[in-house]
C-alpha cells in the first residue's frame, strides 16, 4: 500500500505522513459549541474526520482520536439567559441532540470526548505558564489576555502578518487590551451572568476564553506535541492560529505537525450561515433525506473542496447510492476478508492515501459496482461492500435501503408541512364521516413512503418507510 500523504495547511502542501511515534496517531478535532442544533456544516466536519480516523485505523495505525465539546461560551450563556434555563440544562440537552444527529449519520464516537468545563484547572495552569513566560497579562478590566506581539511566529498557519491584521482592526476606546490583536485567555466574571458561568482563580472569578480550552485539552490528553489537528476551514484563523500561539508559548515546542481543514458548505455559491438565512440543521435535512444519503452526499466530494448543498444534489446522491445498493441486491458477498492485492482495492487505497481523496475512492466503488452487475461474482461484491464500509457506507441490507429509497423518490422528498397538511385533510374527512376520502389520503401517503399511526385522543403521527 502506498504511503499516506496529507495536505498540511501549515506547509500549504501535501506531505508524507510520518507520525511522531511509529504506528501511533494522536489526533484532535475541534468539536461543537453546544447551544443549538447542529447544522449541515457540522455534519460535514464530523463525517470528514470520521473517515480520516477510519482510514488511519484501516492502514494499521493505533489511533487516539479526541473531539472536544465546548460547554461554556458567550453564546451558551446568552442562550441560557434567553431561555430561562441553567447552563447545565441547556448544554446537556444539546449534547444529547448532537449525539443523536451524529449517530444517525454513522459517525463513530471519538476515543475521548472531553468537555471544556472538566478541564478548568488545566486551562488555568496553561495561562499561568504563559504569564510566567511573558506572553500573558491581566488587563485593567480583569481579563487575562495573550500578547500577540510577543509570539514571533504569529500568523504562520494563516499566512497573515501582524501589520495587515492591525491595519484592518478597529478597537473601541473602552478596550483594555495592550494591542488590538491580543485575545482573551480568562474572562472576568460579570454580575449579570448566571450561576455556573464562572470559576475561582488567582485572577479572580471568571471563565476560560475559547482558544485556551482547545490548547489545554489537546495538550493534556495527547501530549504537548501531537500529530494531527483538524477542524473546519473557518477555524484556521483566528482559533487555530491562537491555539498555536498559546500552546507553543506555554511549552516552547511545536504544538502539532499536521493541520487539516475541511472546506465550507455552500448554498448557491455562498457560505451557509445563519445571517444569510441559508442555514439548515441536520434534523431538518434528515426530515427529507435518509441519513446514509446525507453521508454519501458529503463523502463523494473531496474534503477540502466546497460542498454545494441543494435538494438537487441530495436527490442525485440518493440516486447514486441506489445504484451501489442495486449492485448488491441479488449477489451475496462471500465471507472472505478484504483483498488488498485486488486491482480495485489498490486504486481505492491509492485514492485514500492521496490526502483522503474520497471523490476518487467513490468512483472506484462505481467501477466495482459495474463489475458486480456484469459478473454477479460474490468475491467482487465482497470487495465493494468492504471498501464502502471503510467510508461508512453500504452497511444495510440492500432490499431495505432500496425499498426506502423508492418510497422517498415517490414522495419527491415531501416537506413535513405538506405531510401535515394532508394529515389535516384526512382528519377533516373523518370528522365529516367521509371515510373513503380519509382512507384514500392514508393510501396516497403510504404510496409516497409515509406511514400514519393514529394515536389515542385523535392525534396522528407519521414516519417515513
Swiss-Prot record:
SUPFAM superfamilies: Anticodon-binding domain of a subclass of class I aminoacyl-tRNA synthetases (SSF47323), Nucleotidylyl transferase (SSF52374). The lineage of its organism: Bacteria, Pseudomonadati, Pseudomonadota, Betaproteobacteria, Burkholderiales. GO terms for biological process: cysteinyl-tRNA aminoacylation. NCBIfam families: cysS. Zn(2+) binds at residues 30, 214, 239, 243. The keyword Ribonucleoprotein does not apply. A motif ('KMSKS' region) lies at residues 271-275. The keyword Iron does not apply. Keywords: Aminoacyl-tRNA synthetase, ATP-binding, Cytoplasm, Ligase, Metal-binding, Nucleotide-binding, Protein biosynthesis, Zinc. Its cofactor is Zn(2+). It is found in: Cytoplasm. Belongs to the class-I aminoacyl-tRNA synthetase family. Coiled coil: none annotated. GO terms for molecular function: ATP binding; cysteine-tRNA ligase activity; zinc ion binding. It catalyses: tRNA(Cys) + L-cysteine + ATP = L-cysteinyl-tRNA(Cys) + AMP + diphosphate. This is Cysteine--tRNA ligase.
Amino acid at each position: 500500500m502506498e504511503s499516506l500523504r496529507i495536505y498540511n495547511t501549515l506547509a500549504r502542501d501535501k506531505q508524507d505522513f510520518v507520525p511522531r511515534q511509529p504506528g501511533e496517531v494522536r489526533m484532535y478535532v475541534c468539536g461543537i459549541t453546544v447551544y443549538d442544533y447542529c447544522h449541515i456544516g457540522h455534519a460535514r466536519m464530523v463525517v470528514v474526520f470520521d473517515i480520516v480516523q477510519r482510514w488511519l485505523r484501516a492502514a494499521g495505525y493505533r489511533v487516539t482520536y479526541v473531539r472536544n465539546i465546548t460547554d461554556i461560551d458567550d453564546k451558551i450563556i446568552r442562550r441560557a439567559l434567553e431561555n430561562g434555563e441553567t447552563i447545565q440544562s441547556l448544554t446537556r440537552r444539546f449534547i444529547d441532540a448532537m449525539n443523536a444527529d451524529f449517530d444517525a449519520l454513522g459517525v463513530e464516537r471519538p476515543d475521548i470526548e472531553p468537555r471544556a468545563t472538566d478541564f478548568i484547572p488545566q486551562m488555568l495552569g496553561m495561562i499561568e505558564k504563559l504569564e510566567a513566560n511573558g506572553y500573558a497579562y491581566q488587563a485593567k478590566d480583569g481579563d487575562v489576555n495573550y500578547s500577540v506581539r510577543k509570539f514571533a511566529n504569529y500568523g504562520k498557519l494563516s499566512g497573515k502578518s501582524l501589520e495587515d491584521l492591525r491595519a484592518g482592526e478597529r478597537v473601541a476606546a473602552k478596550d483594555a487590551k495592550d494591542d488590538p490583536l491580543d485575545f482573551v485567555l480568562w474572562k472576568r466574571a460579570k454580575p449579570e451572568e448566571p450561576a455556573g458561568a464562572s470559576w475561582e482563580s488567582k485572577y479572580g472569578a471568571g471563565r476560560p476564553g475559547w482558544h485556551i480550552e482547545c490548547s489545554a485539552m489537546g495538550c493534556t490528553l495527547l501530549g504537548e506535541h501531537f500529530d494531527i489537528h483538524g477542524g473546519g476551514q473557518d477555524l484556521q484563523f483566528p482559533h487555530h492560529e491562537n491555539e498555536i500561539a498559546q500552546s507553543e508559548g506555554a511549552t516552547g515546542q511545536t504544538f502539532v505537525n499536521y493541520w487539516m481543514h475541511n472546506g465550507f458548505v455552500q448554498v448557491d455559491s455562498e457560505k451557509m450561515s445563519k445571517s444569510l438565512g441559508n442555514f439548515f440543521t441536520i434534523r431538518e435535512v434528515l426530515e427529507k433525506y435518509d441519513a446514509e444519503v446525507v453521508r454519501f452526499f458529503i463523502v463523494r466530494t473531496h474534503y477540502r473542496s466546497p460542498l454545494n448543498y441543494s435538494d438537487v444534489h441530495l436527490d442525485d446522491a440518493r440516486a447514486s447510492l441506489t445504484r451501489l445498493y442495486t449492485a448488491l441486491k441479488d449477489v451475496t458477498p462471500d465471507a472472505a476478508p478484504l483483498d488488498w492485492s485486488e486491482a480495485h482495492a489498490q486504486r481505492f487505497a491509492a485514492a485514500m492515501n492521496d490526502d483522503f481523496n474520497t471523490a476518487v475512492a467513490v468512483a472506484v466503488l462505481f467501477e466495482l459496482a459495474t463489475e458486480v452487475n456484469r459478473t454477479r461474482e460474490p468475491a467482487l461484491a465482497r470487495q465493494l461492500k468492504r471498501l464502502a464500509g471503510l467510508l461508512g457506507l453500504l452497511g444495510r441490507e440492500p432490499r431495505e435501503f432500496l425499498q426506502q429509497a423508492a418510497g422517498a423518490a415517490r414522495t419527491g422528498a415531501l416537506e413535513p408541512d405538506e405531510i401535515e397538511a394532508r394529515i389535516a385533510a384526512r382528519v377533516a374527512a373523518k370528522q365529516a364521516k367521509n371515510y373513503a376520502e380519509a382512507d384514500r389520503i392514508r393510501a396516497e401517503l403510504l404510496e409516497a413512503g409515509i406511514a400514519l399511526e393514529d394515536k389515542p385522543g385523535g392525534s396522528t403521527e407519521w414516519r417515513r418507510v
